[in-house]
Amino acid sequence: MCGGRPMKAIQKTRHCAKAGFSLVEVVMTLAIGMVLASVALPMLVTAVQGYRLTSIAQQAAHLIALTRYSAIRRNAVISLQTTTQGASKVLYVDLNGNTRLDASEPLLLLPPDMQIANGQSLTPDPSSMGIGNTQNFAGRIAFDYRGAVNFAGGGVTSSYFLAIGYISQTQLGTRAVTVSPLGQTRLWNAPVGGRWAGM
């Protein structure tokens, strides 16, 4: 006995005082976690959407490079074309020259919330790139057997400019791919109302 109470009762009281968290502690922890999540979630969503846009631009650049390498390997003029499937724009390598998307041809399907942004009001002017004259991608880029851009009909030799952006989430800016007359691709990034910068 200790102070009129049995020893077992004292030990039991001590164990009860140490066990678990109080309801107030649990509620406060949850409240702090929810506040932190509500602050971080919009930034996380914006970052993911920015990565998606950059990824699509990189895939477009790779498809253009594949078109060029196909022209060199086949010793022929091969073109990158566009078509529409449902609500999405499709870029594809026209390997057989029939100007139609065939089942075996490499392609890039733009997500329905993205568009080819050439000529859009929020797309910065390509003159800020500092690469000289450019011409907008108008649905076709062709490469000859040397891997150079094939300007059909003796067109002006200038870099092609292909811009990609979101249809509604314009705050994420625009990405672009340029193709030099020699067939080299380069990726660009521009914030809304800003200037183009190489990636």
What are the residue ranges of the model-derived segments?
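N-terminal helix-rich module
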Residues: 1-14, 18-21, 30, 35-65, ...
